Amino acid sequence: MINIRFPDGSIREFEAGVNSLDVAKSISPSLAKATVAAYIDDQLKDAKDAINSNCELRLITVKDPEGLEILRHSCAHLLAHAVKELYPSTEVTIGPVVDNGFYYDFSFKESIGEADLPTIEKKMKELAKKSAPVSYRVVPKAEAIEFFKAQGENYKVEIIDSIADEQVKIYTQDNFSDLCRGPHIPNTSVLKAFKLTKLAGAYWRGNSDNEMLTRIYGTCWATKEDLEQYLNMLEEAEKRDHRKIGKVLDLFHFQEDSPGIAFWHDNGVRIWRQVEDYMRASNNKYGCSEIRTPLIADFSLWQKSGHASKYAENMFATKSENRDFAIRPMNCPTCVQVYNTKLHSYRDLPIRMAEFGIVHRNEPSGSLHGLLRVRSFTQDDGHIFCTPEQVEEEVILMVQQCFEVYKDFGFNDFAVKIALRPENRIGDDETWDKSEQMLKNALDANNVSYELLPGEGAFYGPKIEFHLKDAIGRSWQCGTIQLDFSMPQRLGATYIDKNGEKQVPVMLHRAIVGSLERFIGMLIEHYAGNLPLWLAPVQVAVMGISNNQDDYCKEVFTMLEKNGIRAKLDLRNEKIGFKIREHTLLRVPYLVILGKNEQEQKIITIRKHSGEDLGQMSVDDFCAFLDKQIQAKE
């Protein structure tokens, strides 16, 4: 007999060789039905793995985040199974889990399009209903290579060749086998709520020199209700797509001459200025001085900073007069150069610098997505140089600033996470231990709850991430606060301590809205283009019922502009109903409609974008009304 301890502290006896499914059945049939895996002494295992010794056990169900990930990974295998049934000559490659779903890359011998997805999905449902048990075997690499080579799965052979371990796992369901670390669901009947969503192209291993594969995306959920809710959200997201709204509102455009870099139009620049001016005022409030540094620097600077060895593939390089240069992918190394121009005492610290710095990153063309994923963007970077003793207080201030900013922009629901050391990093473990603990202490001191993200920190330090939830429930990773002991040392930043000795300052990197391009894209989708008054590119449209009111329209328009209102004058010889509809589609918050009565009484009639009639008032009263709303960020 063995003893199994449960999360509530209780201990029960079981026969040696029992598995997690058996344990779940002994508690309740419904629990067994929902169980897909288990943590056995903190190791995630398949639900049918035998337990042969005393242990701590935590069952994982489809309702747990880990369970949902297993469900989605297993659904990717089901997709590959269905594709092999329908198109036997197809070679399968990889099928990972992504946000809200999964994808699988295939090398098809025949042409496949979006129209084929319903057929593949139907086959997936047929296979799932067979309730085929899912099992695995551990085999030597050589045996696995022979197994997949015999099936003509050359991509799998290449993957196995690249694995350092001497043994690998092969999972099997019915007549389909796939290479995988697992764990997976106990049987295919668990997969009930899934849908294939789209098809795209993807290069093998992300390298454009390799074959273009067909990537099929899907989503999978614990229940059909969850799936339906997600699909409804996707439908709503389609309506809010910032690329479509940006075209309607004449904000920006993209073209192939400059892939991944936006061309901003007048209306878009108006929004940009509001965001930038707001952040500039916020930085002033929190004691940041503003700097501006070069976009291009000698490649030796990037070698010193560590970017050349860790980030070179994402950097744009150029050559001039036999010197190698790089266009900056990040602002921090050039900011350190400003700090280094003066001798600093510990009494000078903290020194807070802010920069709206343009950066360029060589993102793969397939990953570009409107304003949300670009190759050139402006970052609202801040860099704070301080002593180790000042770190926690500075982080607390930055967290407060972030919370304040997000609420003013209308994001009231957000989560805080700490991204911990990645595998590819600079600096020793002792420094990383100290850095990670400092961020935890700062959040604890501010009573901020947070989630830990192992392996997701920057190569030079851990970071706090702010994830904002938008109006339709999507989560957006936005601001970051990063702790860095390494870069100031590598770039020669120092200060004189109270003993007259040179010390290296701690460097805090922070971005609150992050990429201004991406943040504006988020705002457009969050508000479905109906931006709050203070952000709207055009706040008021002024129009007359007939051309007889043109002079009065001009007079009202001029008064609004003098009061700092972003107004648009519409004197076109069109029917008033047409003008109202057009400016409503353009999401103008307020429409001023002027007729003979308004002209004679020197008043205005106001209509909200929603269609609500606000009645009549003087221009001065309307300006005061607008100003109050703008100041309140409503």
Curated annotation (Swiss-Prot):
Q: What is this protein called?
A: Threonine--tRNA ligase
Stored NCBIfam families: thrS (TIGR00418)
Residues the record lists as binding Zn(2+): 332, 383, 509
Recorded superkingdom: Bacteria
Catalyses which reaction? tRNA(Thr) + L-threonine + ATP = L-threonyl-tRNA(Thr) + AMP + diphosphate + H(+)
Q: Which family does it belong to?
A: Belongs to the class-II aminoacyl-tRNA synthetase family.
Its quaternary structure? Homodimer.
Q: Domain TGS spans what residues?
A: 1-61
Q: Does the keyword Aminoacyl-tRNA synthetase apply?
A: yes
